[in-house]
Amino acid sequence: MSNIEKLQRTTQLDTIRVESSPNGSAHWMYMHADIDWGVRPCFRTNLMEDMWSFLTSITLRDSQRQAGELRHVVIASKAQAFNLGGDLHLFAQLIRDNNRQKLLEYARRCIDGVYHIHTGLGGDVRTIALVQGDALGGGLELALSCHTIVAEEGVNMGLPEVLFGLFPGMGAYSFLRKRVSSQLAEKIILEGDLYTSDEMYKLGIVDVLVPKGEGEAAVEALIRKQQRSPHAHLAMNAVRGIAEPVGYNELMGITEVWVDTALALGEKSLRTMERIVKAQERLAHSVAA
């Protein structure tokens, strides 16, 4: 990061660490800043609140934007994993309680975030996912919501929700269809297989693939390149919104299907969720140790 412009730490919330350039043109947001406490690197509610709070704080009103001024937001992770997806412990609890309202509130917060990221925080930001560890379920949906996915080799990526009878309902299908055919998007979702980042690159889902340890340098180079033609990249943000829009209502409609599908799951599916949670906890505690 220092090769572009020396970054300074500007924001420290409980679950994220943010480093920003002095002029505010680049923000690197690292999820799971509390990973040393043995927490699971998934979309816990407090992580989402910290992420969306920060992104809202740097979103400019139309009157605040300068013509030709392009900004960048990089989403990365302090944990070994990029993000393992939704909070399955919470899901199982809410499903057992038949609490549709709370489950929908969680899903809506996810949609609020990925929609804001996908639309470039109002249009003047290019969003980049830096995937240096596993991106599963909602973690992959987060990456897919970004304009560009930069991934290091050997990382696992996938949408395994079908293993417990569910589907990824926070943007996966909508965002995948912008990168691959509808048929391939359905295959990835319904088969639930894990892919390496190398395979995802060949499919056209990962935009930039680099060797292990070279992800940050690749993102720096990408930002430098885009900053040489800011007007073109700002225009492309607008063009994407016209030619290939992913609307908020579309995302919310799909996530309501997700909520209703989740509430119909049986005990076998919930036990599968809980086994995955235990595996995540073992991973988190091994890292914290």
Label the predicted regions.
Residues 1-73:
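Conserved CoA-thioester-binding segment of acyl-CoA-metabolizing enzymes
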Residues 26, 50-98, 112-128, 154-155, ...:
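A structural preference for short, pocket-lining loop segments at secondary-structure junctions
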Residues 75, 87, 142-144, 200:
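Hydrophobic/aromatic residues within transmembrane alpha-helices
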Residues 100-111:
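Active-site-proximal gating segment of KS-fold condensing enzymes and close homologs
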Residues 119-134, 145-156, 163-165, 169-229:
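Crotonase-fold acyl-CoA enzyme core
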Residues 138-139:
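Catalytic cores of alpha/beta
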Residues 207-269:
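C-terminal long alpha-helix characteristic of the crotonase
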Residues 258-289:
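C-terminal extensions of enzymes
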